[in-house]
Amino acid sequence: MLRIAGRKLSSSAATRSSSAFFTRNPFTFTDDSSSPARSPSPASLASQFLDQFRGFSSNSVSPAHQTGLVSDLPATVAAIKNPSSKIVYDDSNHERYPPGDPSKRAFAYFVLTGGRFVYASLVRLLILKFVLSMSASKDVLALASLEVDLSSIEPGTTVTVKWRGKPVFIRRRTEEDINLANSVDLGSLRDPQQDAERVKNPEWLVVIGVCTHLGCIPLPNAGDFGGWFCPCHGSHYDISGRIRKGPAPYNLEVPTYSFMEENKLLIG
């Protein structure tokens, strides 16, 4: 019962205070003269309205510019808001360095000069690398043609040149060699082939110097048939490069070649 009575009393008191506040006219303006009352301006009404609520807090709820108070701004913000062409430098923040020690100038000179030489060397290497990269590769050079001078080759001798990474045998045959190559019975050959099919000029025999067995290099002017002998597994080739004895299955390969002049041979 006591709690209910207390709640009724508190609610009735709040109702009376609020009704008293709203029944009171805080915005009444009177003039000292007997002139009729004037209607208040909006600015005065706002000021009086704010004055009614100032008692509810320790500080005024009005903005700082209405109360005449100006807060301090940082220097950077103040400079942005108030730009000026008069720039004042603070000399206290500038540090002056004394001139260098004369005894260390020679060392600095040598260090800088050495650095320039190093940079120049690096630039030179980069340029050389770029230029060399534009040249033909080894694979391209290997596929190029090879020109051979035949004037220095004596009859009955064999010379070896390198073409496409492989040795090429060039033999200048004598009349006896030519007759011996043509007198062979094709039925006795493992890889039958006439001598005329392997040469363009009977005097010159051009074959790739790689054994057709396992890729060894045969020895010229050797073997049982006066041609080539493979020391790896004992294959014998005759004066026309045909296999006559041993494990090799095929004759020595004949590359693509042509005679440019009487004593000029172009391989490839």
Swiss-Prot record:
Residues 57-105 are mitochondrial matrix. Its EC number is 7.1.1.8. The chain crosses the membrane at residues 106-128. It comes from the Eukaryota. It is a single-pass membrane protein. Residues 178-266 form the Rieske domain. It is found in: Mitochondrion inner membrane. GO terms for biological process: mitochondrial electron transport, ubiquinol to cytochrome c. Binds 1 [2Fe-2S] cluster per subunit. Residues 1-56 form a transit peptide. It catalyses: a quinol + 2 Fe(III)-[cytochrome c](out) = a quinone + 2 Fe(II)-[cytochrome c](out) + 2 H(+)(out). Disulfide bonds join C216-C232. GO terms for molecular function: 2 iron, 2 sulfur cluster binding; metal ion binding; oxidoreductase activity; ubiquinol-cytochrome-c reductase activity. Its cofactor is [2Fe-2S] cluster. [2Fe-2S] cluster binds at C211, H213, C230, H233. Residues 129-268 are mitochondrial intermembrane. Keywords: 2Fe-2S, Disulfide bond, Electron transport, Iron, Iron-sulfur, Membrane, Metal-binding, Mitochondrion, Mitochondrion inner membrane, Respiratory chain, Transit peptide, Translocase, Transmembrane, Transmembrane helix, Transport. One of its GO terms (cellular component) is respiratory chain complex III. It holds the Pfam family Rieske. NCBIfam families: Rieske_proteo. Belongs to the Rieske iron-sulfur protein family. Component of the ubiquinol-cytochrome c oxidoreductase, a multisubunit transmembrane complex that is part of the mitochondrial electron transport chain which drives oxidative phosphorylation. The Rieske protein is a high potential 2Fe-2S protein. This is Cytochrome b-c1 complex subunit Rieske-3, mitochondrial. It comes from Nicotiana tabacum.
